[in-house]
Amino acid sequence: LCELEIDCDISKLPEASTLGGGTAVPQPPVTGNTGGTELAVGEEADFKAAEAALEAGDFQRAVELFAAFDQSYPGSPLAAQANLNRGRALDGLGDTREAARAYLASFSGNSTGPVAPVALFELGAALGRLGQVSQACVTLAEVAARFPAAADPVASARGEMTALGCS
């Protein structure tokens, strides 16, 4: 605490020793799951509450909760699933246009993630219901092209393409 003493000159102080008086010991590298993402406080609970509303068929409440989740936790690792579920809730309300936007947000938010094949299928199917058949066909064809190993979404996309008369 040289600065508290009147006659102290910091430039003339000897080099300080390490704290504890010993030499520094190199620490081993940190191992384990440091690359994982952590959820914010309440994030998982908020997601589960929205999911419960969807599962209970309370579509309006689910839409509100998933929208609030999206606003409260931008960049969440659950964002793609939240947007997919919001789309399903909007479909439950009969709002196909907004559902399509939610499916697009889900896919765009993580186009290689675990829900991407389903989100892309749902987007294509919603476009078909909106009468945008050519865009629906292109989008549905992309499911198999991008995610050939995703058996259920690929089969669903092919079925929807047949129903829409895609070539």
Stretches found by the model and what they are:
Residues D70-L78, F107-V115, A144-S156, S167:
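Short solvent-exposed coil/turn linkers within tandem alpha-helical repeat scaffolds
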